[in-house]
């Protein structure tokens, strides 16, 4: 019975907090960080993701993708991330980035908020350090420029190795960073997963 109560509380918390932003221009960066923390505390792993999956950069070679109840529901109804054409307003997807010692080094988030930015499918983009300090928030051009590669999936990439960035595209976005050799191996092993 206790497990059922906890599950109901988790679902209500995720739905209520996400729903609160579903029909607005979006929360403050600090309020969004609180939403991210809920997903972190509940280990709300996105369908298709796994803990400490390969990341593309050597500075953060491991990642974990999280999603709130609305995003997970959208993914499941579509039959997988690759089949999603539009996420529900209030959907929140998060990428945690970890260093080689599996310590959290950064967090990025995308929140779907109606009326926020129709030209970019109403996604609020955000980047935080591990403590929640805001590094970027809003209509972040560099984020949007990369995510537009998967516009047909409503700007959300599937976790690797389901989808991988081409090396040339990766280098254009991360020109001052080193590519994770294990990620390059995945590109060679799964050429069909490289975004075109």
Language-model segments: residues:
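Bacterial N-terminal signal peptides that target proteins for export
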Residues: 1-8
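Cleavable N-terminal signal peptides
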Residues: 9-10, 20
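N-terminal secretory signal peptides
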Residues: 23-86
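Sequence context surrounding c-type heme c attachment/ligation sites in exported
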Residues: 23-32, 36, 80-196
């Amino acid at each position: 019975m206790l497990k059922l109560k906890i599950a109901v509380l988790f679902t209500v918390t995720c739905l209520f907090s996400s729903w609160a932003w579903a029909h607005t221009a979006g929360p403050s960066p600090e309020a969004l960080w609180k939403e991210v923390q809920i997903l972190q505390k509940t280990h709300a792993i996105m369908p298709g993701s796994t803990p400490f999956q390969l990341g593309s950069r050597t500075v953060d070679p491991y990642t974990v993708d999280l999603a709130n109840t609305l995003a997970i529901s959208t993914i499941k109804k579509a039959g997988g991330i690759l089949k999603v054409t539009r996420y529900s307003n209030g959907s929140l997807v998060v990428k945690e980035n970890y260093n080689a010692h599996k310590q959290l080094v950064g967090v990025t988030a995308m929140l779907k908020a109606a009326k926020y930015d129709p030209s970019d499918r109403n996604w609020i983009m955000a980047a935080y350090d591990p403590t929640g300090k805001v590094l970027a928030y809003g209509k972040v051009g560099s984020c949007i420029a990369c995510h537009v590669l998967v516009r047909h999936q409503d700007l959300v990439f599937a976790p690797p190795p389901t989808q991988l960035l081409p090396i040339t595209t990766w280098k254009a976005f991360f020109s001052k960073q080193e590519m994770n050799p294990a990620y390059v191996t995945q590109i060679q092993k799964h050429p069909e997963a490289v975004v075109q």
